[in-house]
Structures are given as C-alpha cells and as structure tokens.
Amino acid sequence: MRQKIKELNTIKGRLGEQIACEYLVKRGFIIKDRNYRKRWGEIDIIATKDSKIHFIEVKSVSVSDCGQVEKYEKHKPEDNVHPYKIHKIRKVVVNYLDEKSSSGIGDFAFHVICVYLNFVSRKAKIRIIENIIL
C-alpha cells in the first residue's frame, strides 16, 4: 500500500513539473535544467529569461475542482517549502551558480509553482509565488 502511494506521488510530482515547464516555456522562459541534484538537495527547474536565472520548486496536489483552488487553502502546497528546505535549496543554488556560471553570480530569483491537478477532468491550475528570499 505504501509503495503504491509513493508511486502515485512520484507520478503526480513528475506531471506537475512537466506542466510547470510547459507553462514557463509559453511565457518565454528557457529551461536549462530539471531535477538538478546535489547530495544536500534538489532544484526542480532551472530556467532563464531576460538574462536572469530562475530557480523553481514545484509543488503538486490533487484536487477535485481546479476552479475552486481557494477551497484547498487549508493545506497550501507551498507550506512544504519550509525554512529547512529553503536552506537546502540555497546551498544547491550557490553550488549551481559556482559550477555553471562563468562570470560569477549573476541576477537570479527563486519561485514556487503550485500545480493543482484534477485527474478526473484532466485539468490543472497553476499558482506562482515569485521572488522568495533565500
């Protein structure tokens, strides 16, 4: 049973990340990396737009009605991006910038994209929390 739930959460997470990537590309972002991992953490999406690097954490949840996302605000997906997770993300961001940026640390931003998935209607709704301070 636990294995089944873990598999479903993995599918939900991957689908949410794919939807978030498509959303970003439609808005002019260029996806540079996905699931950039280091032993202390991971960043779901790394994209660029207007000479700025955007680090994005994606949180996906299943809902019964994408039109009424406000109903699901009791448990917000972004609540899972707690201070310890932000600390780990900060370490990964610094490592990425050291590793990939030839001109040193440039302009960057960190965002959380919440993807609300309705598997019955096969629809999704996206909400973005931009420019979170690391």
Where are the predicted features?
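Short acidic/glycine-enriched loop/turn segments that link adjacent beta-strands
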Residues: 38-41
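Catalytic cores of nucleic-acid endonucleases
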Residues: 60-117
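Short, low-complexity, polybasic intrinsically disordered segments
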Residues: 114-134
